[in-house]
Every structure is written in C-alpha cells, then in structure tokens.
C-alpha cells in the first residue's frame, strides 16, 4: 500500500 504516491 503506497502511503504517498510518486508525483
């Protein structure tokens, strides 16, 4: 689960 998606 990605807490902060890559921009």
From Swiss-Prot:
The lineage of its organism: Eukaryota, Metazoa, Ecdysozoa, Arthropoda, Hexapoda. Keywords: Amidation, Digestion, Hormone, Neuropeptide, Secreted. It comes from Helicoverpa zea. The modification Phenylalanine amide is found at residue 7. It is found in: Secreted. GO terms for biological process: digestion; neuropeptide signaling pathway. It comes from the Eukaryota. An integral part of the sensory system that mediates food signaling, providing the neural basis for the regulation of food response; coordinates larval foraging and social behavior changes during development. May have a hormonal role in females. GO terms for cellular component: extracellular region. This is Neuropeptide F. GO terms for molecular function: hormone activity. Belongs to the NPY family. Expressed in the hemolymph, midgut and brain.
């Amino acid at each position: 689960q990605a807490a902060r998606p890559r921009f």
